């Protein structure tokens, strides 16, 4: 059975960038949190998992469930 890993947006501690992570691995880097969230939302929708957005301090800012929205705009 395939494990479903949520998609996380978090600050990169080594650079002034935002990264999108899934399953403990970085899948993309972005200059703004907004662009990272847009990319993460697409990835979460495709994988039917939750999107968790963290602030620069590491705390969770928002949590979106995209499990049932794979085919929506």
Residue ranges and their predicted role:
Residues 1-3, 59-73:
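A cross-kingdom feature marking charged/low-complexity
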Residues 31-47:
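A short, charged, amphipathic alpha-helix used as a generic interaction element across diverse proteins
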Residues 29-32, 72-73:
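A short, polar/proline- and glycine-enriched secondary-structure boundary/capping micro-motif
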Residues 2-26:
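Short aromatic-glycine-(Arg/Gly/Cys) micro-motifs in beta-strand/loop hairpins
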Residues 8, 30, 54:
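Histidine-centered active-site/metal-ligand motif
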């Amino acid at each position: 059975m395939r494990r479903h890993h949520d998609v996380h947006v978090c600050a990169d501690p080594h650079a002034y960038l935002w990264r999108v992570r899934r399953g403990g691995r970085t899948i993309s880097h972005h200059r703004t949190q907004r662009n990272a969230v847009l990319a993460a939302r697409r990835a979460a929708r495709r994988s039917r998992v939750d999107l968790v957005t963290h602030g620069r301090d590491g705390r969770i800012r928002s949590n979106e469930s995209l499990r049932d929205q794979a085919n929506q705009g």
